[in-house]
Curated annotation (Swiss-Prot):
Residues 193-227 are annotated as: Coil 1A. Residues 228-240 are annotated as: Linker 1. This is Thread biopolymer filament subunit alpha. InterPro entries: IF_conserved, IF_rod_dom. Residues 363-381 are annotated as: Coil 2A. Coiled-coil heterodimer of an alpha and a gamma subunit. Assemble into 10 nm filaments. Forms a massive, conical, intermediate filament biopolymer of approximately 60 cm. Belongs to the intermediate filament family. It comes from Eptatretus stoutii. Keywords: Coiled coil, Intermediate filament, Secreted. It is found in: Secreted, Extracellular space. Residues 390-510 are annotated as: Coil 2B. Residues 511-643 are annotated as: Tail.
Length: 643
């Protein structure tokens, strides 16, 4: 069975149990009328959203598409929006069909809704008790939904998008926008209920007052009637009036006496009550003042103890800071001396810095604990003494308060003395506070100075480190320049030695009268080769070709002139003019010195290595660098002359 209910939220869900499907369609609704029903239709913001019918599950618990009636105009067509799976089938009456609910309910009423509603709800109207069809908690008459077309029959299954919708809306259609909101109706009903309750309460109070007044009035009437009505006694009304007046006068006199006595007693009671209240108030004030003084005394003692402990702690911190400052100064001086020794190049000395931490080794926690225990004992003792001294005074004051104003005056004097003592204690506390503030200010200044000096020392150390790095770089550069100059000096010494050797050999040859052989060759040739055996000398003159090769004999020397282009020789240099010095190296493998070695010997090697200054087999190039040898043509004339 399909049951539709209307709530304030807008959403739709479907549940399938066994073979029967139970569909709940919930949407924003408007309530009209009054009364409640167990079954029936629901009137939503879009019209009639559901009617009662039968449904059967087919293929799952719910549908994922959109369902609608298949056929002509129907009672309700719903476009759903909840994502569920499967389809359901149903047996519709008057255009009822199963729809796959998927949220976003949109109810559209067909033109035959009135007749269908009348036909379907006829079985339930008898249970409700009238032609009205209730919606939610309020009633609505089905005449709001007149029909202009006959009933229609829905198909057994809901299609993916539903069938055609019904005809135009009937003339009796009510726009939900014109209906009041449920919140407004509910608020109005609550306010009316509260007003009715208030009026009922006032009316009940008035009724009670009227009843009370009526009862009092009846009593007064009875009394008046008893006094004024004549009695049936034989004496007659005259004697009764005389007796009543006599008794009334007597009673009135007694009443006046009693009233006077009552007034006097009340006055005396009020006077005594006033005195008692004054004494009680003064006693309570004195007790309160005494209690306040005791509390202030204890508080002041605790504050003084705490202040003293704070002062001791601050003094300890100041001593520790002084020692730390001295230690920092010693470390700084040691570092400055180390840096100065490193910069000036003096001997490195090992410094041992010894810091005396004996004062800091004191167990401050134990000392503070002992001091705290000592002062707690003193505070307890002082509190007990003060209580012992004040307790008798309190008792005396309690006794003397009842004695009279003299005791009050004495108590005021004692209070004045206590106030003076409290003022002195307050002044002492203020003085200690000011002293504590000054000490804290000094500590702050000292800490600031320490931080400032530390920053300055750090900056000085960093600048000294930078200067030290610059000096190290300069020393490295000076060492490199010194090595270069030393290599140059060595090369010059070697060249000077070679020239000296050459000059000594020439002088020896001239002094011994050695001969000189001059050979001239014609044609193109790579160079001349000459050898002087023994202690003789040979001179080979070669045109500027690839480069000559000279072999010096034992004890002799070879001289090559105008070597061009760069040549390869045994102990021969590259460019320019080279001298090969034999003897001591054997087989012509002597040192070769180039005259242009100081000018970086173009094409030669570096100082002390490579071709310019190396002995043995080496590759050297002249200024032109591996240039092609020049071909020279000369006359075929050869002459030999011995001096």
């Amino acid at each position: 069975m399909s049951i539709s209910q209307t709530v304030s939220k807008s959403y739709t869900k479907s549940v399938s149990r066994g073979g029967q499907g139970v569909s709940y369609s919930q949407s924003s609704s408007h309530k009209v009328g009054g009364g409640s029903v167990r079954y029936g239709t629901t009137y939503s913001s879009g019209g009639i959203s559901r009617v009662l019918g039968f449904q059967g599950g087919a293929g799952g618990a719910a549908s994922a598409g959109f369902g609608g009636s298949v056929g002509g105009s129907g009672l309700s067509r719903v476009l759903g929006g909840s994502m569920v799976s499967g389809y359901r089938s149903g047996m519709g009456v008057g255009g009822l069909s199963l729809s796959g609910t998927a949220g976003l309910p949109v109810s559209l009423r067909g033109v035959g809704a009135g007749k269908a509603l009348h036909a379907i709800t006829s079985a339930f109207r008898t249970r409700v008790g009238g032609p009205g069809t209730s919606v939610g908690g309020y009633g609505v008459n089905y005449s709001f939904l007149p029909s202009t077309a006959g009933p229609s029959f829905g198909g057994p299954f809901g299609g993916p998008f539903g069938g055609p919708f019904g005809g135009p809306l009937g003339p009796g259609y009510i726009d939900p926008a014109t209906l009041p909101s449920p919140d407004t109706v509910q608020h109005t009903r609550i306010r009316e209920k509260q007003d009715l309750q208030t009026l009922n309460t006032k009316f009940a109070n008035l009724v009670d007052q009227v009843r009370t007044l009526e009862q009092h009035n009846a009593i007064l009437k009875a009394q008046i009637s008893m006094i004024t009505s004549p009695s049936d006694t034989p004496e007659g009304p005259v004697n009764t009036a005389v007796v009543a007046s006599t008794v009334t006068a007597t009673y009135n006199a007694q009443i006046e006496d009693l009233r006077t006595t009552n007034t006097a007693l009340h006055s005396e009671i009020d006077h005594l009550t006033t005195i008692i209240n004054d004494i009680t108030t003064k006693y309570e004030e004195q007790v309160e003042v005494t209690r306040t003084l005791e509390t202030d005394w204890n508080t002041n003692k605790d504050n003084i103890d705490n202040t003293y402990l704070t002062i001791v702690d601050l003094q300890t911190k100041v001593q520790g800071l002084d020692e730390q400052i001295n230690t920092t100064k010693q470390i700084y001086n040691a570092r400055v001396r180390e840096v100065q020794a490193a910069v000036t190049g003096g001997p490195t000395a090992a410094y041992s810095i010894r810091v005396d931490n004996t004062h800091q080794a004191i167990d401050l926690t134990t000392s503070l604990q002992e001091m705290k225990t000592h002062y707690e004992v003193l505070a307890t003792k002082s509190r007990e003494e003060a209580f012992t001294q004040v307790q008798p005074r309190i008792q005396e004051m309690a006794v003397t308060v009842q004695a009279g104003p003299q005791a009050i005056i004495q108590a005021k004097e004692q209070i004045h003395v206590f106030k003076l003592q409290i003022d002195s204690v307050h002044r002492e506390i203020d003085r200690l506070h000011r002293k504590n503030t000054d000490v804290e200010r000094e500590i702050t200044v000292i800490e600031t100075n320490i931080h400032t000096q530390s920053d300055e020392w750090t900056n000085n150390i960093n600048s000294l480190k930078v200067d030290l790095e610059v000096i190290k770089k300069q020393i490295t550069q000076y060492a490199r320049d010194y090595q270069d100059l030393l290599a140059t000096k060595m090369s010059l010494d070697v060249e000077i030695a070679a020239y000296k050797k050459l000059l000594d050999s020439e002088e020896t040859r001239i002094s011994h009268g050695g001969g000189i052989t001059i050979t001239t060759n014609a044609g193109t040739f790579p160079g001349g080769l000459s050898a002087a055996p023994g202690g003789g000398a040979s001179y080979a003159m070669v045109p500027a070709g690839v480069g000559g090769v000279g072999l010096a004999g034992v004890g002799g020397y070879g001289f090559r002139s105008m070597g061009g282009g760069g040549g390869v020789g045994y102990g021969a240099g590259g460019g320019g003019v080279g001298y090969g010095v034999g003897g001591g190296f054997g087989g012509g493998m002597g040192m070769s010195m180039s005259r242009m070695s100081m000018g970086a010997a173009v094409g030669g090697g570096s100082y002390g290595s490579g071709s310019g200054y190396s002995g043995g087999f080496g590759l050297s190039s002249s200024r032109a660098g591996y240039s092609a040898s020049r071909k020279s043509y000369s006359s075929a004339r050869s002459s030999s002359r011995i001096y």
